Amino acid sequence: MSRISRQAYADMFGPTVGDRVRLADTALWVEVEKDFTVYGEEVKFGGGKVIRDGMGQGQMLAAEAMDLVLTNALIIDHWGIVKADIGVKHGRIAAIGKAGNPDVQPGVSVPVGPGTEVIAAEGKIVTAGGIDSHIHFICPQQVEEALTSGVTTFIGGGTGPATGTNATTCTPGPWYLARMLQAADSLPINIGLLGKGNASRPEALREQITAGAVGLKLHEDWGSTPAAIDCCLGVAEEMDIQVAIHTDTLNESGCIEDTLSAIGDRTIHTFHTEGAGGGHAPDIIRAAGQANVLPSSTNPTLPYTVNTVDEHLDMLMVCHHLDPSIAEDVAFAESRIRRETIAAEDILHDMGAFAMTSSDSQAMGRVGEVVLRTWQVAHQMKLRRGPLAPDGSYSDNFRVKRYIAKYTINPALTHGIAHEVGSVEVGKLADLVLWAPAFFAVKPALVLKGGMIATAPMGDINGSIPTPQPVHYRPMFGALGAARHTTRMTFLPQAAMDRGLAEELNLQSLIGVAHGCRRVRKADMVHNTLQPLIEVDAQTYQVRADGELLVCEPARELPLAQRYFLF
């Protein structure tokens, strides 16, 4: 039997079982757990390569073959870190296994035919498109920025740069919901809208859900009172939608105990649960220990650095329409920014107590940095806390699975859309992101939406090949024309579907129905199920989890930073 060295094999077909790959310039390493390909029967496209007629490509018709095959990909997902070929059919993931020609090759589960396109993923990492569950729809240009960072789904609210939207993630009322759904129809990203949840009577909330709100948002700037919380959650239980909350920083209508009492045992998604983005001062972070609370972070506090506190004060004044000449407004801002709780947030993420990350786009958060900052936290916590059990010193597979779940499967589960997006699994939309390992979490090599390339780095258009400088991200065919409609999805609640809303608004995109939100608990958050007893000292702001003091020094230097953004 002919043999080649492990290095030569990795260079040709990508890493295999036992090989390790470093994630960009972080301290994180992954080890390949399983290889679905067959040694000696690997497929590869190119001159003199395998995927040729009668060799790795068979004679089957389009009905039997894949539309697209990603060859020899290193998949990193919550369920595993594996080497496989990925087959895409009709815009969805159809198979994960061994690609090739079943007429002449053994073990083929991803058939390649004359109607099959190929993306060479040898030496590349493939992840699910990210889900940003805290979007202020302030401007449509956020979509391009997010796509080029590896995010393919938005959950949030807004109507443009209105004062209300600059502060709160709400699309209020049926008229605005209709207009925003129509606007979203032409954006090459999956979208679900949140209506305004601040009401003490249910009728105005029900009409927003039947008008297309896939969830409701309670925000302190609209009054997150116990009455509004109770009413909103009551409607959510009735109509199977998720509720997100930004609680009362000033503790005017009650403290965290009152909010938790109003919530009861009902499921709720708490935004920026640390509190710098808003919420009961100084102890909203305690909510992360509740069995029915699905806690997320927004990215400006991730990770804790020497610049975090100073940056936040100015951001907060702008976003929440505060006046620096009014002493009470300044005190409000300062009450939200606490070094101790920000430092504890990173540790709670590493422990699996915080389940999700998100952006808070243009409203104290950066829409293009969800993926990047999540991995900066993972890196920083490895340096501070060492390997995360059951990982040893050889790889960080469990820590990597924990962190990737925070912006993929967990927000999908939280908002009832995990049957459509959130992981690299058969049957789901082929929203896939390819990364060169050296650029992981920073600059994708390709971003696929519904099986079609939506954005990619592209060189000089007049070049003789695609790679001459200047190279920058550009929209691709999957983001243009009617192709957008068949590769993107608008999420609606069942109540809107029963009404025939998609037909009423003449929506052309794929429609996904969000459901099952009310059954999701903290125990369902993949790799992030910890429910510690969290305590905050009201005088010093020190945070303890199950009695352990959570402290760490701010980072002075980070990976995935300046060296990647010189050009």
Curated annotation (Swiss-Prot):
SUPFAM superfamilies the UniProt entry points to: Composite domain of metallo-dependent hydrolases, Metallo-dependent hydrolases
PANTHER family per the UniProt record, alphabetical: UREASE
Active-site residues per Swiss-Prot or TrEMBL entry: H320
Species, as recorded: Pseudomonas entomophila (strain L48)
Binding residues for Ni(2+) 1: H134, H136, K217, D360
Cofactor binding remark: Binds 2 nickel ions per subunit.
Entry's Gene Ontology BP terms: urea catabolic process
Reactions the enzyme catalyzes: urea + 2 H2O + H(+) = hydrogencarbonate + 2 NH4(+)
Residues annotated with N6-carboxylysine modification: K217
GO-annotated molecular function: nickel cation binding; urease activity
Keyword terms, alphabetized: Cytoplasm, Hydrolase, Metal-binding, Nickel
Record localization: Cytoplasm
Subunit structure of this chain's protein: Heterotrimer of UreA (gamma), UreB (beta) and UreC (alpha) subunits. Three heterotrimers associate to form the active enzyme.
Modifications after synthesis and translation: Carboxylation allows a single lysine to coordinate two nickel ions.
GO CC term, one of those recorded: cytoplasm
TM region(s), chain numbering: none
Cofactors demanded by this protein: Ni cation
Name of the protein in its database record: Urease subunit alpha
InterPro entries linked: Amidohydro-rel, Metal-dep_hydrolase_composite, Metal_Hydrolase, Urease_alpha_N_dom, Urease_alpha_subunit, Urease_AS, Urease_asu, Urease_asu_c
Family affiliation: Belongs to the metallo-dependent hydrolases superfamily. Urease alpha subunit family.
EC numbers: 3.5.1.5
Binding site for substrate: H219
Domain Urease: 129-567
